[in-house]
Amino acid sequence: MLKIKDNVDLKELEKYGFTYDEDWYYDFVLYNENEYSKDYSYLVVIAHNKEHYKEIGFDYVDLEKHFQQAIEKIYDLIQAGLVEKVDS
């Protein structure tokens, strides 16, 4: 499983296009080619207890249409040193 490293301030995700939802997560909207269509998915970083556990997950993901965008976004986070692999 992939997760955001414990020492990462979640505000760093905003540099990569994620927006904060006051409840408990940051999300990045993955659009199909037409940004104005209702064809979209979310790449979500979930922050349980807002600080202790941060995991990367998908919500409403149509992997057939948005797989490449999702993988590229996760790759960007890995390259920036924000993500680590952990045993689930």
Tell me what each language-model feature is.
Residues 15-23, 82-87:
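Short secondary-structure junctions
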Residues 1-2, 6, 10, 27, ...:
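Intrinsically disordered, low-complexity regulatory regions enriched in serine/threonine/proline
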